[in-house]
Design a protein with these regions (language model features):
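Conserved N-terminal phosphate-binding loop of PLP-dependent enzymes in the Aspartate aminotransferase
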Residues: 1-253
């Protein structure tokens, strides 16, 4: 029952084994309402999406929902050094602030001065160079190519925000049939992409074993937040070429 549930945790924007799934806005608003009703904490996993990746400082901003706890990493230091952080609401922090509770969370490398210095400087650069705003603007430019990608016979769906786009690749757009692992579709794709000067995040979730869900290959397009329009145009041109060559190799038409 509800009295056995302490918290609900999920990511606002998929970025890996979940095929880059993005929930409709109403979903998170309803989750927030249910959590409030049953006194359940809402935790956002922004390890990948935090610090500008989706065109906002944090992806939950797209939904207009405030969470109780947020976990972050990766972008907090610009990925220059391993670092993670947990942020909490004023309500969660209140017992600790008043001295009625203690946060027992010490471990060997906690509060590492080099990591903290890198994180502090990374956040300064995000602000000084307007990288979050650039992510939003360049994301809008990237998504102007959405229909061009969808015109490919292998691309069944395109989704995401900011500089985090997912293309779902299938063997047959009509049936939505996915590539069996025996065909090695993703490995072939990445080889062709590298030949064309592109390196993508290798998901491989559906290629190491038969996927739990019959879904296409998730191609994650996540360029640096500092990218400009000319570089996006070049990226799209190279990806378009890669898709054509890969589809010919895989017999997708």
């Amino acid at each position: 029952g509800s009295n056995s549930v302490a918290a609900y945790i999920a990511t606002p924007h998929g970025c890996g084994s979940d095929w880059g799934s993005v929930a409709p806005k109403e979903y998170w608003q309803e989750v927030r309402r249910i959590c409030d009703h049953y006194d359940v904490l809402l935790i956002a996993d922004e390890v990948v999406t935090g610090f500008g990746r989706t065109g906002k400082w944090f992806a939950m901003e797209h939904f207009g929902v405030e969470v109780d706890i947020m976990v972050t990493a990766k972008g907090i230091s610009g990925c220059y050094i391993p670092m993670g952080a947990v942020m909490v609401s004023d309500e969660i922090n209140k017992p600790f602030e008043e001295g009625n509770a203690y946060f027992v969370h010490g471990f060997t490398n906690g509060g590492h001065p080099v990591a903290c210095a890198a994180g502090s400087k990374a956040i300064d650069i995000y602000r000084e160079d307007n990288l979050v705003e650039n992510s939003e603007k360049m994301g809008e430019h990237l998504f102007t190519y959405k229909e061009q990608f969808l015109a490919h016979p292998s691309v069944i769906e395109s989704r995401g925000w900011g500089l985090c786009m997912t293309l779902e690749l299938v063997e047959s757009k009509e049936s939505g049939e996915y590539f069996p692992s025996s065909k090695g579709a993703e490995g072939i794709f990445h080889s062709i992409a590298m030949k064309n000067g592109l390196v993508f995040y290798s998901t491989l979730y559906g290629q190491r074993r038969e996927p739990m869900f019959k879904r296409g290959l998730p191609l994650m397009i996540c360029p640096p937040l500092s990218i400009n329009e000319e570089q996006i145009d070049d990226l799209v041109s190279r990806l378009d070429t890669t898709l054509h060559e890969w589809e010919a190799e895989m017999g997708v038409s």
